[in-house]
Amino acid sequence: MGCGKTTIGKLVSKRTGMPLLDMDALIEEQVGKKISQIFAEQGEAHFRALETALLRYLVEHPQTPPPVISTGGGVVLRPENRELLRTLGFVVWLNVSPHSLMHRNIRAANRPLLQTENPADTLHRLWEERSPLYRETAHRILNTSRTEVGEVCRCVCNLAERFFSHQ
């Protein structure tokens, strides 16, 4: 949620020539609704089920070349999703401090989980809840709180190259 997954995903895709698969954008396209609408009308559990269905599809129908996948921040909440992500390939956690996340999301009306009385507390709670799950899922962790996006892209590409060269 605001760590740069989509931005970095686009840059890594461009640099590597691998296609970008933005899960949130694909779900919006398939359902014909914005993520915020899905949350409001059908709830978070329904949205998480859509994420799981998409990940299952990707595992069952591998693409060549494999895509760079940008996920939603809560994709790791389901154990099955964590397993599916690792099955799909190299997982990088773009770790950002709660303070930096709040600064990046301060005006984000499109973040349904932050539409609360105290978005800072909500964001901190989500970070505390999700961090161990990100850590469990990721092959590598990059702290991106104070790192320029081009440098993050370069690091992700280098880490992925090393990962895939050892498989």
Language-model features, listed with the residues they occupy:
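NTP-dependent small-molecule kinase module
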Residues: 11, 15, 90, 128-167
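ATP-binding Walker
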Residues: 3
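ATP-dependent small-molecule kinase phosphotransfer cores
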Residues: 23-86, 111, 124
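Post-Walker A helix-loop "phosphate-sensing" segment adjacent to the P-loop in P-loop NTPases
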Residues: 14-25
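Walker A/P-loop
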Residues: 6
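A glycine- and Lys/Arg-enriched "phosphate-lid" helix/loop adjacent to the NTP-binding pocket
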Residues: 88-132
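Short glycine-rich anion-binding loops that position phosphate/pyrophosphate groups of nucleotides
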Residues: 72-75, 97-99, 147
